[in-house]
Amino acid sequence: MSKKNIKKVVLAYSGGLDTSAIIPWLKENYDCEVIAFAADVGQGDEELEGLREKAIKTGASECYIVDLKDEFVSDYIYPTITTGAVYEGQYLLGTSMARPIIAKAQVEIARKVGADALCHGCTGKGNDQVRFEGTFAALAPELTVIAPWREWDMVSREDLLAYLAERDIKTTASATKIYSRDANAWHISHEGGELEDPWCEPTKEVWTMTVSPEDAPNTPERVEVSFEHGRMVKVNGEALSPYQCLVKLNELAGAHGVGRIDIVENRLVGMKSRGCYETPGGTVMLAAYKALESLVLDKAALKYREQIGLEFSHVMYDGRWFTPLNDALLAGAASFADKVTGDIVVKLYKGQATVTQRRSPNSLYSEDFATFGADDVYDQSHAEGFIRLYSLSSRISALNKEGIPFKNTGIE
């Protein structure tokens, strides 16, 4: 669709520097109506305060703010937890999880208002452009997608600030606000500025969701969490909604410096990037979930669930939520999650979340079998035959290698 044919655009709007500049840019370059859309995924009231007024002052005809907190936690975070997914062994996928629900809601607004185009403010170097546009392609292939960072000639924060100043558009952004941050109920990410140098240690000013582990209380705190069929339902015996459970754990774990990571990751677009992430409540939830899994799943089931988690981490990171593969992976994880019911105690101390107690009505653990003391339920002599069969292929391989005939070796 040519620029002349685009009449109404729905913009994924955050109120930050990029999307503040995109509104007037769209009107100037596409001569179209701009409708702003913002998703409340638990980033905090301060991020949403005055957002509608700001969008309209900047040139939007309307701004829709949609509360997605409960849906985000119930339909995206919890299914992800059941897969056990951790991208490249460290990243708990906080930004990745939020993109499909935001893009889906943006499509729904576009359909509601009769828009013919969708717009996002993602950089042409990042993962989010793929995540947003992959969702658009899956849910609204007929709508045109506009990506200003791949069109305009502005390349820096200073360029954007100058662009807004020329149009007398006020913004709270400044050239000194160097970090790029993205927050939701699960986490907050920090990128940019001196963090782009992997040899530069993050200062205390980088972190906003957790206290420094060095400054955390000198006394550990224990928190008990309860799951039913893979969903957390209680924190310290108090029944809470999925979203409230996460909020509570963010508060408790953040006070003990839990959930910080500083990593270099492989972006989908081919380059490496350095990011600092805070996921306090999520770190506790995932540790507790996996501890309960280890109690209720047998060896083969747990191994397969781990394979699901590895594949799912890339599906989620790469923006492939709305795909048949993702549906299959989540269905597999859900079948295992149905058994994940029970209670876990996690000790929070100086940046660490350590599981110390576990119980489940579905537990496969038997103290009678596991004891190192005397028992009447397990005949240890039975292990000999098992080991002989288990190691048979290794024994045959060794005999072949040494040229020893099988005869009189006990194999024939």
Swiss-Prot record:
Report the CDD domains cross-referenced here: ASS
Q: Cite the InterPro entries for this sequence.
A: Arginosuc_syn_C, Arginosuc_syn_N, Arginosuc_synth, Arginosuc_synth_CS, Arginosuc_synth_type_1_subfam, AS_cat/multimer_dom_body, Rossmann-like_a/b/a_fold
Record's GO cellular component terms: cytoplasm
Question: Taxonomically, which superkingdom?
Answer: Bacteria
Catalysed reaction per UniProt? Answer: L-citrulline + L-aspartate + ATP = 2-(N(omega)-L-arginino)succinate + AMP + diphosphate + H(+)
Output the Pfam families linked to this UniProt entry: Arginosuc_syn_C, Arginosuc_synth
As one GO molecular function, the record gives: ATP binding
Residues noted as binding L-aspartate in the record, renumbered to the chain: 123, 127-128
Give each disulfide bond as a residue pair. Answer: none
Its Enzyme Commission number(s) read 6.3.4.5
UniProt-annotated binding residues for L-citrulline: 91, 96, 127, 131, 180, 189, 265, 277
Indicate the principal place this protein occupies in or around the cell: cytoplasm
* Pathway the protein takes part in: Amino-acid biosynthesis; L-arginine biosynthesis; L-arginine from L-ornithine and carbamoyl phosphate: step 2/3
Residues that coordinate or bind ATP: 12-20, 39, 121
Report quaternary structure and partners.
Homotetramer.
- What HAMAP family is this protein classified in? Arg_succ_synth_type1
Family the UniProt entry places it in: Belongs to the argininosuccinate synthase family. Type 1 subfamily.
The molecule here is called Argininosuccinate synthase
Q: Which organism is it from?
A: Pseudoalteromonas atlantica (strain T6c / ATCC BAA-1087)
**UniProt gene name:** argG
